[in-house]
């Protein structure tokens, strides 16, 4: 991995005469400290290829049916671990999807450890990495307690053998340190997860809703939240299957929206369709009916090859090119490199309008009122006599 600021940092290192290039520049003109000389606007994550043909993903399971079933059993245990700890630790949805993405990447490149306890230790390290990447990290003891509870209830327990809880906690702690280092090194410190759950929230955030989407008609504004929620559910449910190995995050978000749009058109509003160039204006990937129909078909093949779950879409994924054409209206892109509306050089100015400022002010006021209301409920005002008897704190 090479950071874009590495050369600038190297140039600023002390030379033999004890002066840095930054010192020389400052001596030539007015002395000014510019942190951009030492650090870039953003740090670029390493870029690796994490999408593959669906046939290669299925082949990764192998050809020995007995080994395939054992592999699936270990994978199911890890996915169950993510699901249980997501509820136990009240993790964000995008942390759960990030853990599933990292898990399938690791499996595709390196396979899984041979035993279920080792797989749980691996899953714990992946979940910790996802949590550190996507949200505020939790205390280590929280992970250890939740993992031990999972191993006691759902993990393998030999007949007649009673687990020593305290001993298990120390083992889980040691394995967490070991596997976390291993996962980060083997994945090349590539934390550019391309998380579709995070992307869908960013693409349709309040900022873009008030700056970019002002031309959307009222009828679409009214029904779009329903489609957006269905797309969110679709993305979360894809975590249990290796769909993240099939396409990148932006394409998966588009896939989810089109699935939600087709479903909405079939069940509720036959005349529904996305506006002209809806995806071209919002996604830095090429979207065509043929590409999306192919992905639906490949998704269906992966479901059949991997896990039979209640969340599987099954025949609902049998969506044709004609059905997709009815809900999208995209111009053909002649340039093989699609336009990226989220390029840093384009968005760094942070243009805003009055509507966004009013929206932001309203949200801040609502948040402030809610916090004050909750605080007054949790901490009722004390009687004056009781306040007077309290000693001051130093």
UniProtKB/Swiss-Prot annotation:
Primary residence: nucleus
PANTHER family recorded: CYCLIN
Protein name in UniProt: Protein BUR2
Name of the encoding gene: BUR2
Assembly description: Belongs to the BUR kinase complex.
One annotated GO biological process: regulation of transcription by RNA polymerase II
GO MF annotation terms: cyclin-dependent protein serine/threonine kinase regulator activity
Compositional bias segments (type: Polar residues): 9-32
GO cellular component: nucleus
Span list, region Disordered: 1-32, 372-394
Gene3D superfamilies, alphabetized: Cyclin-like
Residue spans of biased composition, Basic and acidic residues class: 372-381
């Amino acid at each position: 991995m090479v950071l874009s600021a590495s050369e600038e940092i190297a140039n600023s290192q002390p030379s033999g005469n004890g002066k840095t290039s930054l010192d020389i520049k400052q001596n030539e003109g007015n002395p000014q400290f510019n942190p951009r000389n030492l650090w870039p606007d953003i740090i670029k994550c390493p870029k690796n290829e994490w999408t593959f043909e669906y046939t290669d993903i299925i082949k990764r399971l192998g050809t020995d049916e007995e080994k395939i079933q054992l592999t699936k059993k270990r994978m199911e245990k890890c996915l169950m671990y993510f699901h249980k700890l997501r509820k136990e630790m009240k993790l964000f949805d995008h942390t759960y999807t990030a853990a599933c993405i990292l898990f399938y990447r690791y499996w595709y490149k390196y396979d899984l450890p041979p035993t279920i306890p080792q797989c749980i230790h691996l899953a714990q390290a992946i979940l910790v990495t996802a949590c550190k990447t996507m949200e505020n990290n939790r205390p280590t003891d929280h992970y250890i307690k939740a993992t031990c509870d999972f191993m006691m209830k759902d993990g393998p327990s030999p007949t007649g053998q009673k687990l020593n809880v305290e001993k298990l906690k120390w083992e889980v702690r040691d394995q967490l340190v070991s596997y976390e280092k291993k996962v980060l090194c083997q994945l090349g410190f590539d934390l550019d997860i391309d998380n579709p759950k995070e992307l869908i929230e960013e693409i349709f955030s309040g900022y873009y809703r008030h700056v970019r989407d002002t031309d959307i008609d009222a009828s679409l504004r009214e029904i779009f939240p329903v489609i957006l929620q269905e797309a969110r559910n679709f993305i979360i449910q894809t975590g249990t299957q290796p769909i993240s190995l099939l396409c990148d995050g932006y394409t998966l978000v588009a896939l989810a929206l089109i699935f939600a749009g087709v479903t909405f058109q079939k069940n509720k509003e036959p005349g529904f369709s996305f506006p002209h160039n809806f995806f071209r204006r919002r996604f830095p990937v090429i979207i065509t009916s043929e590409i999306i129909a192919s992905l639906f078909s490949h998704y269906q093949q992966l479901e059949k090859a991997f896990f039979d779950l209640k969340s599987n879409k099954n025949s609902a994924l049998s969506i044709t090119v004609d059905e997709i054409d009815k809900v999208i209206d995209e111009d053909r892109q002649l340039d093989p490199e699609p336009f990226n509306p989220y390029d840093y050089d384009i968005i760094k100015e942070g243009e805003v309008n009055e509507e966004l400022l009013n929206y932001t002010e309203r949200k801040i006021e609502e948040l402030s009122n809610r916090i004050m209301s909750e605080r007054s409920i949790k901490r009722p005002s004390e009687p004056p006599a009781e306040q007077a008897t309290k000693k001051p704190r130093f």
